[in-house]
Amino acid sequence: MNENSRLHTHSNIRNTFFSEIGIGISGNSFLLLFHIIKFFRGHRPRLTDLPIGLLSLIHLLMLLVAAVIATDIFISWRGWNDIICKFLVYLYRSLRGLSLCTTSMLSVLQAIILSPRSYCLAKFKRKSSHNISCAIIFLSVLYMSISSHLLISITATPNLTMNDFLYVSQSCSLLPLSYLMQSIYSTLLVLREVFLIGLMVLSTSYMVALLYMHRKQAQNLQGTSLSLKASAEQRATQTILMLMTFFVLMSIFDSIVSCSRTMFLDDPTSYSIHIFVMHIYATVSPFVFISTEKHIVNILRG
């Protein structure tokens, strides 16, 4: 690839990435503002309102931090020092962990809400909001502890002269870890991913089974009230199911790209493509939630 082609490719990736970030920031800002206005107007909150509002706030902050880091990838300037590099990268990774934790807990919460009264999960409905909040806090603190090694391994490297450094941005890079530390960190991350994504898969499978039962029951009964109720539950649950499926697929694809980049190819272009993939979920999710809000849809149609 000649220099002109390389610059053209770099420019296209930059424009695409910043467009993605801009769309994601707009969508999450709108969704967060909607939930804030809804809260202050005294509307009766749904059990899912808190995690959805929290998720939009997390994604908003994550995309803002990603935009700042991206300026150091696509735009040449004087660079950052060690403190700025450590702070931004650690904050970004922590927000990504929060996104995973909140998404997983949202899936579990929706499964609890959908459970019939005769099911054991229905017992958690009354305290589900409090329990989910505590679980999110616990998992977030745990993940931030796992990611604390970044405060040591991230460093400012204006002039990279060693191939062992892993590219993060023009000013920041990741110092190589010892084999033992890398193994411990990788194991902890894998356990975290398996646990949280496993919760999503279990809760998603549970909801699919319940929806199937609702559908069969609605077909057997002639009453309209049950059909309407089942339809409302279907709409809410299908939104979560779609997001969970999309999130799991993006997580798997992100892991594949990340591993291939670490093992085979490490350059600014491949990294730029990687960070574009990482933010697809944060960009798309607010619009999925917005499309299910009747108040917003009615206003937009009017």
Curated annotation (Swiss-Prot):
- Glycosylated at which positions? 159
Q: InterPro entries of this UniProt entry?
A: GPCR_Rhodpsn_7TM, Vmron_rcpt_1
**Biological process (GO), any one:** sensory perception of chemical stimulus
The segments annotated as topological domain Cytoplasmic are 38-49, 115-131, 215-238, 291-302
* Record GO cellular component, one term: plasma membrane
Which Gene3D superfamilies does the record cross-reference, listed alphabetically? Rhodopsin 7-helix transmembrane proteins (1.20.1070.10)
Extracellular-side stretches of the chain, per the record, are 1-16, 71-91, 153-193, 260-269
GO MF terms held by the record:
pheromone receptor activity
Please provide the record's keywords in A-Z order.
Answer: Cell membrane, Disulfide bond, G-protein coupled receptor, Glycoprotein, Membrane, Pheromone response, Receptor, Transducer, Transmembrane, Transmembrane helix
Q: List the disulfide bonds.
A: 85-172
What the record says about disrupting the gene is: Mice lacking all but one V1ra and V1rb gene (12% of the V1r repertoire) show a lack of chemosensory response to a subset of known pheromonal ligands and changes in maternal aggression as well as male reproductive behavior.
Cellular compartment(s)? Cell membrane
Q: Which residues cross the membrane?
A: 17-37, 50-70, 92-114, 132-152, 194-214, 239-259, 270-290
Pfam families membership: V1R
Query: Belongs to which family?
Result: Belongs to the G-protein coupled receptor 1 family.
| Name by which UniProt lists this protein | Vomeronasal type-1 receptor 48
Species this protein is from: Mus musculus
Q: What is the lineage of its organism?
A: Eukaryota, Metazoa, Chordata, Craniata, Vertebrata
Gene giving rise to this polypeptide? Vmn1r48
